[in-house]
Amino acid sequence: MYDNLKSLGITNPDEIDRYSLRQEANNDILKIYFHKDKGEFFAKSVKFKYPRQRKTVVADGVGQGYKEVQEISPNLRYVIDELDQLCQRDRTEVDLKRKILDDLRHLESVVANKISEIESDLEKLTRNK
């Protein structure tokens, strides 16, 4: 799993926190950030440079003119797919944690209200005797 990341020398992809991608001249610059350890001010990161792929395409759709366009490298596209899987999984785990905490707070509220209702009913019973 994560063969493309491992081919970049990233031995533990689960340590990846986030990534950034920018274009610089004829290159795409990928920067991968790892989770910070306690006591570290900055997250460890690694940077990779991918040359953009050049293609010649029909410019006007009629077939008379051509123009050169640059696209992201196919290898980089595969790496980004793996990074998106990792980063999306982290977001999903955070969303699930938030949902569980919200459900727990709601349950606390429901239980507190039910306890108050039962105590009120008990109070009514003891006053009537």
Swiss-Prot record:
Covalent S-S links between cysteines: none
Domain of life where this protein originates: Bacteria
Record InterPro entries: UPF0325
Family indicated by similarity: Belongs to the UPF0325 family.
Protein name in the entry: UPF0325 protein ESA_03178
Species whose genome carries this gene: Cronobacter sakazakii (strain ATCC BAA-894)
Lineage, opening ranks: Bacteria, Pseudomonadati, Pseudomonadota, Gammaproteobacteria, Enterobacterales
